[in-house]
Every structure is written in structure tokens, then in C-alpha cells.
A protein has these predicted regions:
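Beta-strand-turn-beta hairpins that frame and shape the catalytic cleft
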Residues: 3-9, 92-102, 133-140, 232-233
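Glycine/small-residue-rich loop that forms an oxyanion/phosphate-binding "nest" at active or ligand-binding sites
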Residues: 49-55, 61-91, 100-112
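Active-site-proximal loop/helix segments of hydrolase catalytic cores
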Residues: 113-185
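Active-site environment of divalent metal-dependent phosphoester hydrolases
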Residues: 18, 43-47, 67-70, 91-94, ...
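Binuclear metal-ion centers of metallo-dependent hydrolases, dominated by the metallo-beta-lactamase
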Residues: 72-96, 180, 184-233
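Pre-active-site segment of Zn-dependent metallo-hydrolases
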Residues: 3-42, 47-54, 74-78, 110-122, ...
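Active-site neighborhood of phospho(di)ester-bond hydrolases with catalytic His/Asp-centered motifs
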Residues: 10-13, 33-41, 61-64, 140-144, ...
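Zn-dependent metallo-beta-lactamase
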Residues: 1-10, 15-19, 101-108, 208-215, ...
């Protein structure tokens, strides 16, 4: 995400994932990143965050427990993970002179921080969703990995969500039907499906998600993004 002021935010940056053929190339070329936002500690969401943080000096934005675990267990630079950029559910961080507001909201999922040595997961607190609001710009709701839950309806009481990034893959998160119901609870202008197709187990598809939105009479626009695609809003 690039703000109107030119600042760069990454959310769950797994550039070297199996479906991004240019991932290693993009990772090597990455230079300017201001903040890395991480929703929970699973390896497919922490992704390349530590490497990028060390390389670019990007500050880590995460819940207090996850931030501490990423510093102690994964080696994220401690000077880039302080109280300025750590918080918890219901709290809002004011970044870049209030140009960016980040609010932590719940997600229903696991959160253990995993290492490459097959050791047991390390406590990483609770998983989160993120609301990212840009000054004089759109507000995004990134659900993180989650199931549907009724408190999603509270999001729209405090935030007008323009774009909802919603997991649809099934198996480890909600699938298309439950994701469509989540969209109805939040009522965003645009819904962008995510967290599907990376592994065989993630069987949910954008087409199925679109059909479920139609069944529910959703007024939200469905926007399906290709890997590596950029959109301007």
C-alpha cells in the first residue's frame, strides 16, 4: 500500500509465496518500506517481514505480544518494534503525523509464531484484523485469517470501510459463503478476496465468493486482483 504522501506499508508480506513467480526478484528489489503490518504469527503471514525490516528499517506494526515474539524468536530489530507501533484490540495507532490510522480488531484464528527449525510454535498473542484509514483517503479492513463472527458488524459503527480484504480460502479460514456473510455485516464499497489458491487445501475461489455475494443481494463491488497487480483507489 502506497499512501498519497508516498509512504509504503506492507501487510503480511510473504513475497516468496508459491504463486508469485517474481517473488524473489521483487524481494531483492525492495528498498523503501516505512511500516510492516502483521496480523498473526503463522509463517505464511509473517512471511519475509524480518528480512524486509532488517533491509529497509521498516517499523513493525503488530499487537504487543506478536511484536515481542517476532523480536525475541525471529530476530526482528527491537529498535523497530516499540510502543509507537504496537497496540491491541480497540486501540488506534497514529502514524506519520496522523496520515495513517491503524486500528486493531479481533480475528478468530490461531496465532502461534513458527520458526524454520520445526520447533513448537511460540506464543504470539491473539490474531488480529486491521483497519487502515488514510487521511483524506479510503479506509481498508484487512480481516486477517478468520472465521465469520457477529462482531464484524461493529466495524461499520466506527469506520466507513471503502475496501474489505477478506479471506475466502476455506479449510483454515472461512470459505466463500461465510466470507460473503462477513461482507454483508461490514458493508464495504469494494470486497477483494484473499488467502486462496496458495495451497491445495485452500479450495475457496473468487467465483464461488461472487456467487455467494449475489445470493445475499450484496451491494458491494467484487474486485478480484491478480498476483502482482496494482490498483489505485
Amino acid at each position: 500500500m502506497v499512501t498519497p504522501g508516498g509512504n509504503v506499508l506492507l501487510i503480511d508480506p510473504w513475497l516468496t509465496n508459491p504463486v508469485f513467480e517474481k517473488g524473489k526478484e521483487e524481494l531483492a528489489a525492495l528498498k523503501d518500506v516505512d511500516f510492516i503490518l502483521v496480523t498473526h504469527g503463522h509463517s505464511d503471514h509473517v512471511g519475509n517481514a524480518v528480512e524486509i525490516g532488517k533491509k529497509t528499517g521498516a517499523k513493525l506494526v503488530a499487537t504487543f505480544d506478536l511484536s515481542a515474539a517476532m523480536v525475541t524468536a525471529l530476530g526482528y530489530p527491537s529498535e523497530l518494534a516499540d510502543t509507537e507501533t504496537t497496540g491491541h484490540f480497540g486501540g488506534t495507532l497514529n502514524l506519520l503525523g496522523d496520515e495513517v490510522l491503524v486500528t486493531f480488531v479481533p480475528a478468530w484464528h490461531g496465532a502461534g509464531v513458527t520458526k524454520d527449525d520445526n520447533s513448537p510454535p511460540i506464543y504470539g498473542g491473539n490474531p488480529s484484523g486491521l483497519i487502515v484509514a488514510l487521511r483524506n483517503g479510503p479506509a481498508f479492513y484487512h480481516t486477517g485469517d478468520t472465521d465469520l463472527f457477529s462482531d464484524m458488524a461493529l466495524v461499520s459503527r466506527f469506520h466507513k470501510i471503502d475496501i474489505m480484504l477478506v479471506c475466502i480460502g476455506d479449510h483454515f479460514t472461512m470459505g466463500p459463503a461465510r466470507a460473503a456473510e462477513a461482507v454483508n455485516l461490514v458493508g464495504p464499497g469494494i470486497a477483494i478476496p484473499m488467502h486462496y489458491g496458495t495451497f491445495p487445501a485452500l479450495t475457496g475461489t473468487p467465483d464461488a465468493f461472487g456467487e455467494e455475494l449475489k445470493k445475499r443481494g450484496a451491494k458491494t463491488e467484487l474486485r478480484v486482483m491478480n498476483v502482482g497487480e496494482t490498483i489505485t483507489v
